[in-house]
């Protein structure tokens, strides 16, 4: 293919000097599949794997087999490509809503630099084991000769340092008090590892889930000069206990800020609904705290067709909610032609203790209902990623669904969220906790690419969250 289709400088010289005829290269159209496979081989950083949407229409989607598993690859959009083609030294902040390609751009830039500078080391940090697993799998396919690009969570990186530098680390204690022992390892690392300048480039995805102190610690491992620190951020996706809407992150100094607003994930109608949710949420927060100048939720722009309007379905009780879930599954399968693997059922928590002392085990109730209906399902554990071959419907709490996307999401049992209303609007912590639950809503509704069904027993009078959702529909 290269010999017949690529003109290098030597062949160009022969053509100019008329030693070769240009017509031999123009005798027929290029085979687009062969051309795409060639580009995937020589510049894999410009491709995204198993994307549900076909982004760049100038290049066909290609499929290939790796280790007995079939993958698809599509070329990045031209707006994504420009951030991979031009990379500046210094601290770069990429900020954008869910679906704007932050992780895709991050991995593309990381692979690009690692291939350009094979003598230097680079590292990617993510907040979840799930995304870490996915990016490692993508890296194995896209960067086959990799020996200088690592992917870690902060804890896995610290465990690696502990093993290498004989730090005191009791792995069992992490399960008892994660924060305490993570901070202990960070202190040890600072004291023991004097020369921490290990990496030419560091990439922090999901930076909203990292503390400022953790980002500062990570950045200490950069070279002193000619380094690259990329930070990818969306405040609305912060569902950690460290969320503080009253605290600015301006103390993280950046040389360049890039705002991402093109939504590569979702259909137009769904994006418009989410944009209204963003606007209504921002307005509500600012009526309570006008001093909050920056929007927590940012709108995105659609590049796809209309799609389906999201639905909010009101039911009477838990039993009717389960019946509605089963009905929606049947509708999506038989009327919309979706496979079970295209559908996710999302709920806030696996279980919740009620005020009367009883505990509702929602995941157990849901699993039992699916089994009785003979509907195959799988639970969204850390090993389940966007690349994983799925068997059946995915069921997940709000933490398991992060980093996953499906054609259809059935979001139910919103009643489990603790902050349906703000009891005392004078209390900052109550407003902060309410925003934390709004963030959980934002995360769940953004897991869908086309169909969104929200099922609830609450109405506008009993829940400010439901009021915002209904106002957005």
Task: Map each language-model feature to its residues.
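Conserved helicase motor core of SF1/SF2 NTP-dependent helicases
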Residues: 72-73, 78, 82, 89-145, ...
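Short, flexible helical or helix-coil boundary motifs
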Residues: 19, 23, 46, 50, ...
